[in-house]
Amino acid sequence: MSKSTRFALNKLTPPLELNMKQILITITAVLVVGCANQDIKLIQAVQDGNLEAVEKYLAAGMDVNTKDGYGATPLLYAAEYGRNDFAELLITNGADLNARYNDGLTALHAAVLNGSNEIVKLLIDQGADVNTKAKLKNFLTSKTHISTPLDSTIVSHNNIAHDLLRKHGAKTGEELKAEGK
């Protein structure tokens, strides 16, 4: 290749490192824009206990069932944090009662485990599945087992939720397994 041809090609094609820099900038921009889920603000407002912000975000049309990296929805966090008013508001706005964390636990599991018995009652009254099953892995034995909200009452010693769930037909994972469910 002649010297003049190489010179012409260099003028037409930017140096490789400049191309790579531009490619990396473009990829970064795409990732940032693609991953910037504005509805996460709704989850943050629930976690922060900011009911006014939750109301504002819902009124603005944010997705009531948005999920974070853990698979958690605003309702799951309301149950986990024992935020009754938030749970009522989210359910009124169409929150999925049976949404799951990535590990399979639901808002009913979370409310039971955290002693949020008003939310347990609310979820049951609104139609949450009292026999929903989560497949949990024991990190010590690497075995998996089925956990229902009733199983969670046993682990957390939550007798109030236990009685409430039993009254509404809840069963343990072992009971469901024995029934072939």
Set out the residue ranges of the language-model regions:
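Positively charged n-region of N-terminal signal peptides that target proteins for export
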Residues: 2-4, 17-23
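Ankyrin repeat structural motif
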Residues: 50-58, 83-91, 116-124, 158-166
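C-terminal motif of bacterial Sec signal peptides marking the signal peptidase cleavage site
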Residues: 33-34
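Ankyrin repeat A-helix N-terminal signature
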Residues: 44-49, 77-83, 110-116, 141-145, ...
